[in-house]
């Protein structure tokens, strides 16, 4: 039943349409033009972006995407479509659309599809468990911008984060236990979160606090020594200080400390993508083994796991139930 005419908008970061230099350039131009992502003065940043970053970075990033591209397309989009389909089946009668903050399918296209179905209450669910101004707030900005073109807008419920949701912690615990059962318990379990500039945290972003909260709850949930669970941050961009410790530096130092077997989980990524499949599963694995490590296993993202879809359903129904009461 959908008496309240609810509609769900799942949002993820985005992906290029193809693993080509031209497609990557278009995608990066949109992504890196967002002031939530790069907050430098446009007068300073645009010449850097178009004069240096896009000409030199696009071809290199295209080669990285080619390593992880599947017959169905970009893993992020493939899993996003599966999440959309499976969640719609669970919600039975409530339409679900997938939109990307950058690239396709666009937020505009997704919202338009929902409003054509007479949705009166829009539930926006960014697929970022931990809030950050550079990700979650960018979704809010994007949705608000799209709604400006409509005379009548729907009511909106924005799910800001779910870093401590019991179903989220339970789903992560399940994936960790499956990996331990398959590969044995490692010397260290490393939780790798996407990094952001330290300056963002210093000026009020709660992202680091939310990552630490998820880590603390996971430590309590799993049957594994808490002192053997580590945190680190990946994917830094540019020269300024980002959240530490950095994943790549951690990979190079652990073997010297006698740590020969590690497993890595990226709790902040709801779907596997370039940052998990290439950066962690391939590049950082190589760093660890080259530094003297012996065993490295990457624990997949929640993707289209049943426990992940159940989590998304609970997040949506939490709002629907409150509206119906």
Curated annotation (Swiss-Prot):
Catalyzes the ferrous insertion into protoporphyrin IX. Fe cation binds at residues 194, 275. GO terms for molecular function: ferrochelatase activity; metal ion binding. InterPro entries: Ferrochelatase, Ferrochelatase_AS, Ferrochelatase_C, Ferrochelatase_N. GO terms for cellular component: cytoplasm. The gene is hemH. This is Ferrochelatase. It catalyses: heme b + 2 H(+) = protoporphyrin IX + Fe(2+). It holds the Pfam family Ferrochelatase. It comes from the Bacteria. Belongs to the ferrochelatase family. Its EC number is 4.98.1.1. It is an enzyme of class 4 (lyase). Pathway: Porphyrin-containing compound metabolism; protoheme biosynthesis; protoheme from protoporphyrin-IX: step 1/1. HAMAP family: Ferrochelatase. Keywords: Cytoplasm, Heme biosynthesis, Iron, Lyase, Metal-binding, Porphyrin biosynthesis. One of its GO terms (biological process) is heme biosynthetic process. It is found in: Cytoplasm.
